[in-house]
């Protein structure tokens, strides 16, 4: 079974649960070092999100609305102000800054991408379907107090 895990997240997103399919996947972010604890940084009203691993310091680009999802990847809509600084997210309950990150991706599926993009534009291939997703939800769980924000980011990307 192929899941709609975007190319840039394939080495980091571990699917969890029984509900994953070609049309949606939920997973926990894990660094290549094995750590699941991250600082969360955002810019452009959470339109650009990066994670920094608390164990090894690796930066992971989680989402960039100008590059990822249908509008960013397929349409090339990049309206973001890339001069804006990143801001570190802290837990609203305890003010700590270490989180476990869960991501939910929704997709129209591979066949839709083949019909809409590959059939009409030679710049796309069949493997690109995972990058043209329609929705992303990012959930954060504070590692200090276990406070949860189930929809810290909840964005339609098409």
PLM regions with names:
Residues 119-158:
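Acidic, proline/glycine-rich low-complexity IDRs
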Residues 2-15, 24-51, 57-79, 87-131:
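Short recognition patches in nucleic-acid-associated and regulatory proteins
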Residues 84:
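Extended, positively charged loop/linker patches that create polyanion-binding surfaces
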